[in-house]
């Protein structure tokens, strides 16, 4: 399906690009999340009229994300979990737990924005986690997992 992107989408393209994607990806993700529209002649003409407005909104989102990213980059947060004497956690610290921790600290972060390439944290100690505030703004945050011996 041919679509026109209404914002920058990772691994796909930038605002205004006309790309071909699988029908399911367009119908189930891009179009419902208002990231794209079908690339009909009418939609392309309407997009060209609204292009400046959409670019302004995208620039504002990027600037806001960069401002939050400057505050958040390099920050360290502590989370306490029950653990055994060998340093392994009972359970794990997931991206949802980290997003909740960041929300309590005053940052608007969804769990999908927290990237944990090595999977959930299962050991006590310091771990570096990435937070993707925008497709162009990715910051590193240190999570210090403290063991609460049961």
UniProtKB/Swiss-Prot annotation:
Classification via SUPFAM superfamilies = L9 N-domain-like (SSF55658), Ribosomal protein L9 C-domain (SSF55653)
| One Pfam family cited in the UniProt record for this chain | Ribosomal_L9_N
Arranged from A to Z, the UniProt key words for this protein are:
Ribonucleoprotein, Ribosomal protein, RNA-binding, rRNA-binding
What one GO molecular function would you report for this record? structural constituent of ribosome
Q: Which GO terms describe its cellular component?
A: ribonucleoprotein complex; ribosome
What GO terms describe the biological role, i.e. biological process, of this protein? Answer: translation
Q: Which family does it belong to?
A: Belongs to the bacterial ribosomal protein bL9 family.
Task: Show the PANTHER family listed in the entry.
Answer: 50S RIBOSOMAL PROTEIN L9 (PTHR21368)
Describe the function of this protein: Binds to the 23S rRNA.
Q: What is this protein called?
A: Large ribosomal subunit protein bL9
Q: Which organism is it from?
A: Burkholderia ambifaria (strain MC40-6)
């Amino acid at each position: 399906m041919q679509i026109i992107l209404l914002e920058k989408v990772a691994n796909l393209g930038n605002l205004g690009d006309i790309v071909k994607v699988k029908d399911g990806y367009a119908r189930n993700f891009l179009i419902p999340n208002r990231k794209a529209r079908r690339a009909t002649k009418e939609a392309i003409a309407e997009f060209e009229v609204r292009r400046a407005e959409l670019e302004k909104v995208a620039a504002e989102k990027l600037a806001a994300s960069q401002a939050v990213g400057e505050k958040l980059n390099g920050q360290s947060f502590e989370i306490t979990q029950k653990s055994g004497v060998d340093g392994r956690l009972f359970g794990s610290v997931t991206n949802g737990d980290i997003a909740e921790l960041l929300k309590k600290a005053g940052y608007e972060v969804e769990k999908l924005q927290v990237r944990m390439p090595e999977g959930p944290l299962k050991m006590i100690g310091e771990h570096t986690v990435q937070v993707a505030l925008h497709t162009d703004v990715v910051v590193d945050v240190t999570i210090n997992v403290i063991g609460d011996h049961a």
